[in-house]
Structures are given as structure tokens and as C-alpha cells.
């Protein structure tokens, strides 16, 4: 059976499996501030990244592109601190925001989160704390001690309150790593240097101390060895005993001489110190005693970072392989381990008590029983109370303490036991009952309350029942804590806390009998019953049936309470609650009608029986409520006529709920019953509902009762809003009949809805005394003529004067017209006009009189108004008309009068005298009217003069429209008459613009020729000359040349450009030539006429440089390069040298180009010119001139020219140029092309450029100059990027030997790199495999192993392949290769060395199979090597299958110590086969893991007796005693048979063996069996058997021994019984605990307790002196 371990070891993840580069797993790049996150800085390609691994989701690492020197994650949240140089930043990753930043003055060499919001910063000189909250800067805590100078800082720790700070560093001194620490006290501000490697702080509460102590633990590996120190820092808190210092040795194995502590964490849960060393060892120490609990190696690699593992209260760390490992205390095993393995029961007890750990149950039980048996009840009580997991807190323990009587003057052991339990915490259920029973019997209820408040008792239903008889409220508290719903609710009801019942029931999910509860509550208090009932129905789903609840109310005749309950319960007005609503109203209508009225008034309910309630309301005198509920018309009419009993406002609203027919019937009934009383209410109803009842029906209703008063008031209420003409008419009628004349006037004046004709006729027939309503109607609706006739014929002339004077004076013209129609006297009319003068429209008056041809009637009145200074146009218009008709000098009036309306008077004159109409229209600038008159009467001369004088472009545009049929005669008059007469330039300008705007070019030319060519005032006008030429260009191009030659005062450049745009190139050329603009002239010839010959002739004629330049440019564009260059030379113009050079390059005119560039160089020393001149000289092969030129002063780009010459293969010229600028790289390339290899190599050496070396090298290879090629190649191969191309170049041409020679020569170079060694290895594999092994053995560390692996595999170099796999740590592939190619690759030592390192264990079994097939004699050696990781069961099964077990017997013997079943059985089978019974017996005794029964059954049939003996031994070992004894008897193994029978403890088997001995007459054996099986045999049976077989002599020694033992037992029993009687007599005189008058637990300080003996195993119990407070002492 495997040994139990006190720790649990776990690998959480492998960082390399998450894609983390192994090179980045180290102290400088990986941080772990807690067990939540791991943070790694990596570089992927050129990008720096930070990888954050959340330990709760490790398979999804977070990668962020962050370039920082260091990154540490917050211990709890996704907040990261970054350091880059001296800049510190804190970021919140989830919020994607920067929280804080700071720039330090010194470099931070180490930093660490010391809490959730504080970072510690360590510089070369000091330590700072930086809070991430607020805006605070880092705060300096202390300066670094000189002892840490030059140390690498590896950790920084603080205690829980950050009062003690510790900085840890290491340094190399005297071939060992020395640890240095600086301990700093914040309160004292002092430091202490300490030698140490790892340390931590812990809070530990010693037994007997009230406060925790701050402990400082540190480990050191000095020259003398390792030590762990545990000390208390600072002054112990008041009342605390100081913690005794501990210093224990730390064991380091002999093979780990250089090992030292690197990390320490302390488990607060278990008070265990975890110490980790550099070599991967873990040590566990007890914090209190310093005892080493366990030590083992957990990692082959250094664990360089650790943190507390919160989930297990252990330690978690990362090693250099990337394993994330954790170690914690195995709670189930640590106590048994300390007890059994360490043999330290004291420590086991201590830890079990202190940390509540299981595993020490037997120790505690043994100690308790021992103390109890000794009578040390006080210590026994402490042991029982302190035992972990409450293993001794059982009813049996309480009964044992109850059975012990209390000593006089002392507290009983039971109460001592309870006192200790109360000190420690809560009592369990049984303990609480047993303690409370005597407390309540003594009336100490307050003690119980105190314990409940302190949560010292475990509440139960039984405890509640016990308390209830004393205090129901306290019992309620107990039931609540015990969660006994039925008892809780019962107590709530009994104590009147009904409001809590429903809430509690819902909370715990309990459903009691609510109706039963309600009856009980109602019996006690109706008000509380009502409250409880309301709580039952307050939810959407009532807890009880509401009908049953109402029945309970009615049982106690609680109408008021029931009403209040139902009002609340039925407030949601559900359809299903209709019967309950009816019941509520019914009970109140019978007993409290006013309450019912209020309920109905609130309209809370709608689902009750309305008919039944209506009848009850009528009986109760609630007519209004009855009407609300009646649906039958008969019932409604019966009630509604009693209006004196009803609220009028309500009754009006009530009618809104009736149908139209029912409403009219009720109104009719009300009017019939008492019209005087009910008329007003009927009018109100009619007014409000007239739209629904229809106004017509209501009018007919009132008319049927001849109630014009009702009709007037009804219609008066709606007439202001009604649009019905009949309503307005009926209202006017009713008002007339009731004498309301003022209302008639108002409605006639304001209403727009009545029929005016109908009202007019009614008012005429009504013969009212006041005609004002009629006047209003006629005035509003234009019945003035009828009104005048009616009033004039009825001799009511005074109303006519009233009308025009007071009502509407503006109607005077119509009235005058009417009076003229009835032949009224002119004097009357004139007087009427004079009376109302100025308040009417003169135009209308004139129109009315004019229609009747009586205009002269107004002449005196008009002249009088003008005399008065009237400027009204209408007056003057009328006067003008009279003068025109009477021909009273009208033209003078029209020209001089400024007030008349020209348009009106002109219109009046059109048919009478067109000339007068023109005068009137011209005076008023009535353009359109004047044009129409002139056109109709052919007055074009007048019109043309008017238009010229008017100067209106829009007016011109209207008459010059093509659609105007009078345009031509008008234009003729304008040209011949109007413009000839004018001297105003503006009039001419407007006219010309008008012709231009109208697009009349021919007419415009005609007009302009008249003006310009006929020697008028405007002949030399520049704009008119321009306009004439431009118009000709547009309209008649044949005249353009004539105008150009005749006219001189025009804008020549502008006109010429316009001519060009209209393609009149010859005209343009003539203009330029006339005005000597030669450059423009030649431009026209070149660009527009396109005749270069004419241009050349023109250039020769004028011989101007600018003209030659333009001609040259044109010739260049046409490709006439030679001619163009000649022209440029004549122009002496080098400005276009770039275009000339490009054209000459394209056409190859190099000789001409040389001439041009030489001319250009004289003008301008441009770099471009000189550069192109050099290239032109090279192209013309003038190398001597070229060399002379470049050796002289110049600005040319010689390098650029050299490159061009090189590109065009002019190598001689290029050679001169490159040599001139010392470009040895290109010079070397040029020399290569010239075949001068040696000179090319020299040039390449001077250039020292990789590209040049490559070019020269490749050229030398092509020229088979391998010596020179190697010289070049040695400069190339040192560049890894160029190596592949060079190798391919050699290989493609088959020069393998030369390539290998070059690479071999290159290996000794200073800059030799991995690629060279790799490629040479690959070449060896292909072309010289015999050299590859030697090369690899020398340089395997400098080759790219994966590439060489592929090459070796392709070349079938299996030995070399294995060698590489081994060096590359691909051990699996190495083994596979050796097994696949044993002839070439297998070597025994190498195979056994590599096989132990493989990752895939399956290869072990393939290796076994391989050895079995090829090297069977070496198989055991292999198995010995494989055994640590081999599955022995599988291996044995395999060898059994292939029947080779004997071959591997040495292996099986070597691994049998694992006690493997398959191994054991296989070896046992081999021993049986070899008949080696001694080896078989040894194997069986040493290793028990095999099928015992099967082996025994097999051996019992074996031919050799020793094997059958082993079978009996096996049967015995498996409790098959009978088979074992029978087998011994069969083989006469008497001694074995007796021994096995004795060991069986089976009396029957022993007696059967005795009988068998007698049957076989083996009397000596009989005698021996009596003593061997002495304890099993019954004396009477032995006596009978011996007597019957007459062998008493053989049995006599047995009987003597039996008699001796029995007599001794009887003597002891007698003495014991006597002692017991004496004790009973002494006990009867002492009282029992419950008979005491006072509870011993509350006896107070007067009870003295003697000092107790200490616990066993070195455990010291806490001193028990004064009683502890909190148990009810000092009552």
C-alpha cells in the first residue's frame, strides 16, 4: 500500500502548450502577483507583446501589443501596471482606460503589488509605495541599506497592516549565493539588515492570547547550513504573551550543496510554512513549533516565482519549463501522517485542535477516556470540547457527564463541559436541550435570551416546545431560527403579530390552513382579523377563498369590517368577483344605505347583479342610484319625473346614458307631468344632447307643447355654435314671438348660417315696428336694391337716410342707383350725396351714374371737390371723362393734370381718340397699353421715339420678339427716324444692346453701319467699331475683312482672338500683321493655319528671336528635330533644352545635339545640360573629348551618365566615368563585362559591397576563375541572407567540389555563422556523406538541426540522424530511427541513454518488442533502465503473451518491490514451474498483491508436499481455516494443523482437530493440541473426550492450568463486588445535580477550581482560573 502524503501536488497548466516561448519563461519576463493571473512579456517578430493568462480561463490567453520593460497584473482585477524606462503607468484592461501615470527620477529595479491598490517600487537607493487611487504620487518609505548594494532584488513583503516592510536580495559571494534582507519598521522608522534568502510575515493567535501576534519567518542557507527562524516582531499587544522564538535546521541533501531557499509562503488556514528551494525542493513547517512536517522534491527545474494559492490555502509557482504547480496541505492525510509517519502525536493533536483537522479521532477518544477514567472531568471536558469536527460532542458524552455526580462546593462536570462549549461557540441540538431544560426550570429565562442573542444555541422544534410553556415570544424566536413554520405561524397568531404570518409563510414556502387561522384570530380580535384577511388577498392570487373569508366575517356579524375587507379585496374589479360585489352592496343597502351609496358613487365595481341592486336602491330611497341601474324604460319613466328629488346636474348627465328614443320619451313624460316645473331641466337636457337627439326632433317636441319660451331658451343655447340654417331661422322666429327684438338684431348681424332670403321675407311679413333687423339682413346680403324699393314704396324714407348715414354709408352708390331707378328727384339725390360725402367710393358712384348715362349730374359735385383740393384719382378720372366727351380742351387736361389714372382714362380714349390715349398712356408709362394702341393704329414712328426715349431693355425685348408681327416696320422707324434724331449716347447704347439681346445681327449691322460708317457723331466710337466687326463675324463673315481694313479704332488683340475662336484665321493673321504683333501672327500660322513653310518664310522676313523660338518649338513637336535645333540656334534660345534632349535621344541626332548643348552650355551652366553633353559625347564615341571634359570643372552627374552608359553596354565610356567618380562597385561590374577579372576583384575589394562581391563572384564562376570566385565568395558567405543564392548558383552549374572547398575555407572566418555550418552539413550529406559525422560531432551546436535533420533523412544517414535527434532533444524520433534502422543506427549505450528521456511511453513497449526480436540477451538490461516509468502490468502481460517470462525473471525480481499483482503472479508461476518453494514462500510473505485463493487451489494439488504446505498457509491467510487444517491433516502436517486451528479462534474447528487426533491415535499430538488451542477449547468437552478415550494422563496438565485460572478469576470478582458495594453506599449520601437550589453554571467566581494536570502527549491545556465572561455569571 502506497505511503500517505500530507500534501496535494498538482500541475495546473504548461505555458509552452499555450504558445509561450520557453526563452520568455524567466524571472525578468514572467510575473505572477497572485493565483489569478500570469503575465509574460514576449516578442513576436518585431512586435513586443504582453500575454496575460487568466487562471480561471487559461486556454484563452490575452495578447496585447505593449512595449514595456516590465508588466505586473493586479492581484484581483484586470488592472495592469507597466514600466518603460522611468515611466510608470496603470491601465484598466476591461475599461480600456489609463488610470494613473508617473515618471520616476531614478530607475525602478523591482516592483510588486503589495495590496489590491498599492504598488511597491524599489530603486537603487530607496523604496516607494504608490497607490493607484486618487492623484497621489509615489511615497518614499525608506532608504535601502548598504548591505543590499549590488544585490539582485528578488522579493518585497509587508505584514497585514503594512507596518513592517521587508526587502530581499541575493548576490554571488565566495562561490555561493548570499541572501541579504532589510527589515524596516514604519512606526519606529528604523532598519535592520539580516542575512536571509526567503521570508514572509504571518498573523498567529497563540493559545491564551487575546490578540494576534505578527510573526516574521525567514530562511537562510549560510556556510554552516540552513536555518528557519520564526520570531515575533515589535512589542506584543497588551495582554499577550510574547511568542517564543524558533530556530530550526533546514535540511539540504548532500547532492544539493549549492541549493538555497528562494520562496516562502505561509498558509493562514493551516498555520503551515511552505519553503521552496532553488533545486525544486519543498519543505513544510508548523508555524507554531517550527517542526518540519514534510520535505520532497516537486520540480526538476527552478521555481522562480510563487504566490499564495487561495483555493487550497497553499502555494502556487512557475518553474523554468513553464509548469504552473501548486502544493497544499492534504487535510485528510496530514494528521494521520504526523501521527503514524512522524510519530509525533503531540503535534498531531495540536494541529487538529488549532486548525480543526480530521484524523486524530482515535487520539482524542483515547485521551478523553483516559482523563474520564482518572476522574479528571475538567480536562476531559476540555478535550471533548476541543476535539476537531465535534467528534466527541455526542449525546453519549453528555450522558457520561450527567452520570458523574457533582462534588460539594464545585461546579458539576456537565456544567463545566457546557461552559467550555459556550466559550468556544455554538452548542448543537442535543447540547442546547440538555442545557436549557434546567435553566428554564430555575426561571433563568434571561440566560436563554442572552445565549440566543449570542447565537450560542442550536435551535430546534424540541427546544421551542420546551421554551413555549415559559415565554411564547421567546419560543417564536427559537422556532424561527429552527425553521419550524407551523409552530412559527401558531406563535405569531397567539402573540398578535398577524401582519407577519403571510410574509413568513411566503418566505419559507409553507401553506397553513388559512381559514382556520383566520377564525382563531377573529375570535381574539376582529380588527386584527380584518387586517389578517386583507393580507390573505393582497396578492394577485389570494391565499384563501374570499367567499369563505366573508363567511367568517358574517359568522361574527362584522358588517363594517367585512365591508372594509371586501372593498380592499375586490379593488381589481375582476369579472369572477361579481357575486361578491353583489353581496357587498346588498348587505350595505340593507344595513347602511349611505355606505352603499358611497360605494356606488365611487364606481369601483361593474360585475354585480345590476337589476337586483337597482330594485334595492329604489326601496332604500336612492332614486339616483336606481336610475343608474334601471334598464327598462317603464322603470326609468316612473322615477325620472320626480326631478325635485334628483340632482339636476346629475340628471342632465344621466340622459347621456339613454338611447335617443328613450331620452325623447322621458322628456315628453317630464313635460307632460309638470311643464312649469320640468321645463328648465328639459331645456338643459335638450341643449346638452341636441346633437344626439337631433335639433329638429327637439324643436318639434317644444312646438308640440307650444312652448316658444322653451324653444327660445333651447335654441339660444345652441345657436351660437350651430351651422344649421333652420336653427337660426327658428331662433329668429321664437325671438320675434317672445319680443326679443335686440336678440333678433344681434343674430341677424352676427349669424352667417341663416337663409337670408327666407329671413328677409319673414321680416317683411312680420311688419316689425323697428326695421333695423331687415336693414341689417339686406345690407349684409346685398339686398340693398330690394331694401330701397321696399322702404321707398312703404314711405319709410327716413330709414333710407338712417341706413346710409348710420348703418353703412359705403352703400350710398347702390342706394343712389336704386333711387335713380325709381325716378327719385335729382334734388333729393344731390342732397343725399351731400349729406354722406366722403364716406363712400367715388368710383362706384361714378359707375352707378355712368351706367344710367347721368354722369353730368355729378359735374358740379366733382368740380366742387377739385376746388376743395381733392387729389382722389377717381374724381379726376370722372372729370377727364366728362371733358373728353364734351371735347373741352382734353389734351391739355391730360398732359397737365397729375392726379388722374392714366390707364383708366387711356382706356376710355382708345376708341374715341387714339392720339389722346397715347398721350394718357405715355404720361403714365403704360407701356403695354401704348404699344397695343400704336400697333392697332400703325403709329410706329410715335412708338419708336417712345421706345428710344424710354430706354427700357425689357420693353425693347417685348417689341423685338420674333412673334411680334409689327417688328419690321418698327425697326425701320427706329433706324430711319428715332436714332437719327437722338444725340444721347445712352439711348443709342440701350437700343444697340436691345438688338443684340434680341439676336438680330443683320438688323444690328444695318443699324451700326448707319451709325458708324455714315460719318455720324458716333463714327469713331471704339465699342461700336468692335461691335460692328464682332456682329459681322457672327452674322456675315464676308464683310469682316472689309471692316478690318476700313476701321482703325478697334481692339485688335481681342478681335483677333475672337476671330481665331470663330476659325477666321486669315482675318486674325491680317489683324496681327496690320498691328505688327509678329509672335502672335506666326503663332496663327503654326497653330491654326498649320503651314510651317509660311511660318519659316515669315520668320526669315521679320528675323526676330522670339519668332524663331516659336517656330523651333513647333518644328520640335512635329518631329523635325534637325530643323528645330537649327531654329533654336538661330534664336540663340537654350530654354527648351530638356525637350530638345528628349527629342534628340528619341531620334538619335547626337551630332546636332552636341552642337545645341555646347551653345546651351555657354548660356547656362546647368547640371542637366552638362550631364547630357557628356552622354552625347559618349554616344558619338568622342572619348578623348569626354575625358577632357570630365577632368575639367563641370556640374555634370557623372555617376548617372556612367550608369546609363553601363546600361547601354558602352563599357569603355562607363569605365572612364566610374573611374572618375571612384565608384569601385560599378567599376568592378564594368571590368567584368570587359573580361578584366583580376582588375574587377581589385575593384570589388575597394568597393567592399556585398552586391559587388556577388556580381564579380558569379562572373568569375561563369568564367571558371574559381580561385578569384572563392576570394569573392568568402566575403559573401558571412552574410546569412546571401548564402542560399550563392550556393544555388554553384549547384545549378554543377560546381559542388568548388562550393564545398569554399565553405570549408570559410568555417575559420571570424564571422562564420550557423547557416554556413548548416549548408556545409547538407552538402556533405549529398556529396560527401563520409565527412558528415565528423562535421556534426565538431559543430552540432552551430548547425540548424531541423534543416540538417531533413537532409540526413533524405540521404538515409541513419546514424547521423539519431545523433542529431539526440542533440535536438527529439528523443522519441531518435529511438524510432534506431529501431527502424538497427544495422546502421543502433548502439546499446546510446539507446539506453536516450530511451529514458522519451515523452511517449508507448515507445517503451516498442523498444521491448525490438530487443526481444533483435537483442534478447540484453533485454533485462533494457528493462532495468525502463522500470521507473514502465507499466509493469502491461509489460508482464506482453511477456506472458509471447511466452518469454523466464527470459525476464531478473527484471521481475527487481520490480517486485512495487507489489504489483501481475508481477507477483508471474514470479509465483515461475517459482512453481522451477519448483523453488523457498523462493515462492519468500515472495508470498513479502508481497501480498496476488490472487491468494486461486494460487492456493492450484498448489493444493501439487505433487510436492512443500507446495501443498504453502497452499494450506495461503488458505489460513484468507480465513479459510477449515480447508487449511484439512490440507494439513491430509499431508500429516500436525504442527501446522494445530497452529492454524489456534489462529482461527474457532472452537468447533479446534475440537474437530482433537477428535481427528484421537481417531488417528495421535495421543501426543492430542496433548500438544490442548496447549496450542488452549483458549479455544471448552474444559467440559476436553474432560469428556479424555475420559471416554482413556487418555486422562495426556489431558491432566491442561486441567491443572484451567483450575488455576478459574480460581484466580473468582477471587478477583469477589474483591471487586465488595468494593462496588462500598462505593454505592457512599454515593447515596450525595445529592444529584438537578436537586441543587442554584444552577451551577451561574455559581459565579466563588467556585474554586484546583489546577488541572496537563494533557498527554505534551499538549498543555489553557489555564482554567477565573470563569470567562459571557455565560451569565454574576447574575
Curated annotation (Swiss-Prot):
Residues 1213-1522 are annotated as: Involved in binding clathrin light chain. It comes from the Eukaryota. Its main location: membrane. One of its GO terms (biological process) is negative regulation of hyaluronan biosynthetic process. Keywords: Acetylation, Autophagy, Cell cycle, Cell division, Coated pit, Cytoplasm, Cytoplasmic vesicle, Cytoskeleton, Membrane, Mitosis, Phosphoprotein, Repeat. GO terms for molecular function: clathrin light chain binding; double-stranded RNA binding; protein kinase binding; structural molecule activity. The N-terminal seven-bladed beta-propeller is formed by WD40-like repeats, and projects inward from the polyhedral outer clathrin coat. It constitutes a major protein-protein interaction node. This is Clathrin heavy chain 1. It comes from Mus musculus (Mouse).
